[in-house]
């Protein structure tokens, strides 16, 4: 089949005329030497200019990377060779190499040598380990030596192209050429070796507009390629693909098949004359140099021609050589996820065509090799030719004995047991075909599915697929497009019913043939089904699987990998890369079987599979169950305490949540469980949870809401002990234990608040608190401390104090016992009461009232003296006036001080 050369431009770098290009073997860099004397390094992944070397003012006709030394070596029209370190941009060395323009540089792949050619008709060998001494001079050409290239299969041999119309092949160590190839009518500009092991070929391009292929063993021209309209300036065998790339001063780059010599493609990017080309082993990138800049294009698919059967036998093609490896041969060797497998490779022979794709049939007995417009079906064991033919595309059916080929853009043929069974023309043409349970045909109008047996249209879908993957059962299918993928269910029973009755058939087929299960916005590169689980590699190099609407990431890949298959008995998934390295990742078949059973709602089967799932994998399964809505089963399966606790909360399983909270000893969990217990009216459990969580605020809310005075009392003591002073204060206050509130404020140094509390609720304690406040404040501000008026000394500043003593005593006697919460509706709210009025007529006991009036305290705390002589009162007033006159009031709020009217008048 024709080469499917997807050609994508990766970089366009506008610049002055480009005389040579090179690609770095490990970095994403392109080197371009310019006619204006500069050398540039471009990053073709980021499309940015990363380095520039100002070499000289004359054209730089040659530049090469020496990656093992971190060098760029340049040759210019000033006859100088310059060596730069491309990391530091420092010039490492410079010397005069020739007596005329330097045309080409070739770097030896293993030795510390470079070869240079020049218009002085000489080729020179330089050894950088010997201080860049000239080790050898090769004489023989009679005109400019335009290019030299080292033989990749024999590093001691190189070839040269000259304007004397000849190609000479040389040996290192010999000053005269081995032989000369003649055939061009004009000067030869370029030359290259074929790197494959099957052909001893050279290619050359000349000013006679021809490209010639030479057999350098027989010293004959085997092919001449015609097509360019001007001088051929560059020609190259691609090191990976079966193609020849030629560039000309006519502005075109032509791509030829290296086996058939058929012209496959012509590129013209409108950048004037083409001067140079560069490619790299292991890469599909090709660099091109033009008059107006340089371009990098990516040719073809990087996906390797590789396939694996269900038993672990892998077949791949390395160029035209077919090789095999068997995973069984590894035995019980330990395999680590993502590591390259040490496989023993066996040569199976060469293929008559260049393989672009290799694919086993479903039962693994046969393998088809496609390429060059042909297909060959071999036996998988011995690679014996079973069948062959011409085709643009090939697809296996679900039935191993059946397959289809796309003969042209309008004809599809179906074969059974290697014999043609049916040929048909799809209504809207055939741009591509897809195998599987149904035959898929893509056209400009969309995708059409046909029955393999009778080619009846099953369903037409307006979609442009890239890949189609069928499950083994034929129930599920994944259709992958350029931007997303769809999971569909094939309703075969409905299709059979319609085929029998022919009812409900439209021009687009059977409407109910498929049911859409989901669309995922992710690009699928390669994929396969295991049960009802779709495993795939994505465009961002993730290895995922999709089941039941959930995407699970198995691994993050460090490079592009291609799925080969899954072997259930190994519980491993196998992938390969473009270098034909095989890696694997663990994926338990029991997990996939369980998820498949759940998706089919076959819980009896799921219960049978569950014991085979290792404990470390059960939490993953539980998350899957949760997402499917089976939270009760997820709670049973999960082994992660965090996950189980969350599920228990969601399901209201108090006992399980309590056990998990006890094991975890987490305050957060106790709080969450307390909320659940309150919502379930389990107040005893809620109290215990809040206690474990040390949530005193929550306990206070619970205690007050339930009217539990004993709980409030214990909470007050506990909160005070643990330093939760706000909760302790509120707990004491709610119980009417104002004296305890006061002592708490004093102990915590909140003396101003204590003074106001005492003035409001415990006037008998005001004097003591003010004294403590004054002592404390004097350490900071003596004047502010002196401004505090003690009620024992300035009784006139505290009107109603005597009555307050009486009210305090009345409150103590009448509110000694707490009222039951059930009497709350009968109690007058505090804001509606006048305690002074209620206490009228109350006579405090003699022992207390008389002591207060006589100035003798009833308790160790000081109280205000009830009466003073007139002289003492007058003296006190005078002293206060003097104090007030001498006091600077700084940040003192006097708005709440009640002064007597006569003092205000004075």
Swiss-Prot record:
SUPFAM superfamilies listed in its UniProt record: WD40 repeat-like
Function (record text): The coatomer is a cytosolic protein complex that binds to dilysine motifs and reversibly associates with Golgi non-clathrin-coated vesicles, which further mediate biosynthetic protein transport from the ER, via the Golgi up to the trans Golgi network. Coatomer complex is required for budding from Golgi membranes, and is essential for the retrograde Golgi-to-ER transport of dilysine-tagged proteins.
Protein known as: Coatomer subunit beta'
PROSITE patterns: WD_REPEATS_2 (PS50082), WD_REPEATS_REGION (PS50294)
Annotated positions of the Phosphothreonine modification: 861
Taxonomic path: Eukaryota, Metazoa, Chordata, Craniata, Vertebrata
Pfam family, one: B-prop_COPA_B_2nd
Coiled-coil intervals, chain numbering: 866-890
Major location category of this protein: cytoplasm
UniProt-listed InterPro entries: Beta-prop_COPA/B_2nd (IPR006692), Coatomer_complex_subunit (IPR050844), COPB2 (IPR016453), G-protein_beta_WD-40_rep (IPR020472), TPR_COPA_B (IPR056176), WD40/YVTN_repeat-like_dom_sf (IPR015943), WD40_repeat_dom_sf (IPR036322), WD40_rpt (IPR001680)
Location of Phosphoserine modifications: 859
Keyword Cytoplasm: yes
MF (Gene Ontology): structural molecule activity
Subcellular location: Cytoplasm, Cytosol; Golgi apparatus membrane; Cytoplasmic vesicle, COPI-coated vesicle membrane
WD repeats: 13-52, 55-94, 97-136, 140-180, 183-224, 227-266, 350-388, 390-425, 746-783
Keywords for the protein's UniProt record, in alphabetical order: Acetylation, Coiled coil, Cytoplasm, Cytoplasmic vesicle, ER-Golgi transport, Golgi apparatus, Membrane, Phosphoprotein, Protein transport, Repeat, Transport, WD repeat
Subunit structure: Oligomeric complex that consists of at least the alpha, beta, beta', gamma, delta, epsilon and zeta subunits. Probably interacts with PEX11A. Interacts with SCYL1. Interacts with JAGN1.
PTM-bearing positions, type N6-acetyllysine: 627
GO biological process entries: endoplasmic reticulum to Golgi vesicle-mediated transport; intra-Golgi vesicle-mediated transport; intracellular protein transport; retrograde vesicle-mediated transport, Golgi to endoplasmic reticulum
Membership in a protein family: Belongs to the WD repeat COPB2 family.
Membrane-protein topology: Peripheral membrane protein
GO cellular component terms attached to this protein's record: COPI vesicle coat; cytosol; Golgi membrane
Annotated spans, Disordered: 837-863
């Amino acid at each position: 089949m024709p080469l499917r050369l997807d050609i994508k431009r990766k970089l366009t770098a506008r610049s002055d005329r480009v005389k040579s290009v090179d690609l770095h073997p490990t970095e994403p860099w392109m080197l371009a030497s310019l006619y204006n004397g500069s050398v540039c390094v471009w990053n073709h992944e980021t499309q940015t200019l990363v380095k520039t070397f100002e070499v000289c003012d004359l054209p730089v006709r040659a530049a090469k990377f020496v990656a093992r030394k971190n060098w760029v070596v340049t040759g210019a029209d000033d006859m100088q060779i310059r060596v730069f370190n491309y990391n530091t941009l420092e010039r490492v060395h410079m010397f005069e190499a020739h007596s005329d323009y330097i045309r080409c540089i070739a770097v030896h792949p293993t030795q510390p040598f470079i070869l240079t050619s020049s218009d002085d008709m000489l080729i020179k060998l330089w050894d950088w380990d010997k201080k860049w001494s000239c080790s050898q001079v090769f004489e023989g050409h009679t005109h400019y030596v335009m290019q030299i290239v080292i033989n990749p299969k024999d590093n001691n041999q190189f070839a040269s192209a000259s304007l004397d119309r000849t190609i000479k092949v040389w040996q290192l160590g010999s000053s005269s050429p081995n032989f000369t190839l003649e055939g061009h009518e004009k000067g030869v500009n370029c030359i290259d070796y074929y790197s494959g092991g099957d052909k001893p070929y050279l290619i050359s391009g000349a000013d006679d507009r021809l490209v010639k292929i030479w057999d350098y063993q027989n010293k004959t021209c085997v092919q001449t390629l015609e097509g360019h309209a001007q001088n051929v300036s560059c020609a190259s065998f691609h090191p990976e693909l079966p193609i020849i790339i030629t560039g000309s001063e006519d502005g075109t780059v032509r791509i030829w098949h290296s086996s058939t010599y058929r012209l496959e493609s012509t590129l013209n990017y409108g950048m004037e004359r083409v001067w140079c080309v560069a490619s790299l082993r292991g890469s599909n990138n090709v660099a091109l140099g033009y008059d107006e800049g340089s371009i990098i294009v990516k040719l073809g698919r990087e996906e390797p021609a590789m396939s694996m059967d269900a038993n672990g036998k892998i077949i791949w093609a390395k160029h035209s050589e077919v090789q095999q490896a068997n995973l069984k041969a590894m035995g019980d060797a330990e395999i680590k996820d993502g590591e390259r497998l040490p496989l023993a490779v066996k040569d199976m022979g060469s293929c008559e065509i260049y393989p672009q794709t290799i694919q086993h049939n479903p039962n693994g007995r046969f393998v088809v090799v496609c390429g060059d417009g042909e297909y060959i079906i071999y036996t998988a064991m011995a690679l014996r030719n079973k069948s062959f033919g011409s085709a643009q595309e090939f697809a296996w059916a679900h039935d191993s004995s059946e397959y289809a080929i796309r003969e042209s853009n309008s004809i599809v043929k179906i074969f059974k047991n290697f014999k043609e069974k049916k040929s048909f023309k799809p209504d809207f043409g055939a741009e591509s075909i897809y195998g599987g349970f149904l035959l898929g045909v893509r056209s400009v109008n969309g995708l059409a599915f046909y029955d393999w047996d009778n080619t009846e249209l099953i369903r037409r879908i307006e979609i442009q697929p890239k890949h189609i993957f069928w499950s083994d059962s034929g129930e599920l299918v994944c259709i992958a497009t350029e931007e997303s993928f769809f999971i569909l269910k094939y309703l075969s029973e409905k299709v059979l019913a319609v085929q029998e009755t022919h009812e409900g058939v439209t021009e687009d087929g059977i409407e109910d043939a498929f049911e859409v299960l989901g669309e995922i916005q992710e690009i699928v590169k390669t994929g396969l089904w295991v049960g009802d689980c779709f495993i795939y590699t994505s465009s961002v190099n993730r290895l995922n699987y999709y089941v039941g609407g959930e995407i699970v990431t198995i691994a993050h890949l460090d490079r592009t990998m291609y799925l080969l298959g899954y072997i259930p008995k190994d519980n491993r998934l196998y992938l390969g890369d473009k270098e034909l390295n095989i890696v694997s990742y663990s994926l338990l078949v029991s997990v996939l079987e369980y998820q498949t059973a759940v998706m089919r709602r076959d819980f009896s089967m799921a219960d049978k599979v569950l014991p085979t799932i290792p404990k470390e994998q059960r939490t993953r399964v539980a998350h899957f169950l949760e997402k499917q809505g089976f939270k009760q089963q997820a709670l049973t399966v999960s082994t992660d305490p965090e996950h189980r606790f969350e599920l228990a909360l969601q399901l209201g399983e108090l006992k399980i949540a309590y056990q998990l909270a006890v094991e975890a000893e987490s305050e957060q969990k106790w709080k969450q469980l307390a909320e659940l217990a309150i919502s379930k009216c389990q107040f005893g459990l809620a109290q215990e949870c809040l206690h474990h969580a040390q949530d005193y605020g929550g306990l206070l809310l619970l205690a007050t809401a339930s009217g539990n005075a004993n709980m409030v009392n214990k909470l007050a003591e506990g909160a005070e002990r643990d330093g939760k002073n706000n909760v302790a204060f509120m707990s004491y206050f709610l119980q009417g234990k104002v004296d305890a509130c006061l002592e708490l404020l004093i102990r915590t140094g909140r003396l101003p608040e204590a003074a106001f509390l005492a003035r409001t609720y415990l006037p008998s304690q005001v004097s003591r608190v003010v004294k403590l406040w004054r002592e404390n404040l004097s350490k900071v501000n003596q004047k502010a401390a002196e401004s505090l008026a003690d009620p024992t000394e300035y009784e006139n500043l505290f009107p109603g104090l005597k009555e307050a003593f009486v009210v305090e005593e009345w409150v103590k006697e009448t509110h000694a016992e707490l009222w039951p919460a059930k009497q709350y509706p009968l109690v007058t709210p505090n804001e509606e009461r006048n305690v002074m009025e209620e206490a009228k007529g109350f006579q405090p006991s003699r022992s207390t009232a008389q002591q207060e009036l006589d100035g003798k305290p009833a308790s160790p705390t000081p109280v205000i003296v009830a009466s003073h002589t007139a002289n003492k009162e007058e003296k006190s007033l005078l002293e206060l006036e003097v104090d007030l006159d001498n006091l600077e009031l700084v940040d003192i709020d006097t708005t709440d001080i009640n002064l007597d009217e006569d003092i205000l008048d004075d």
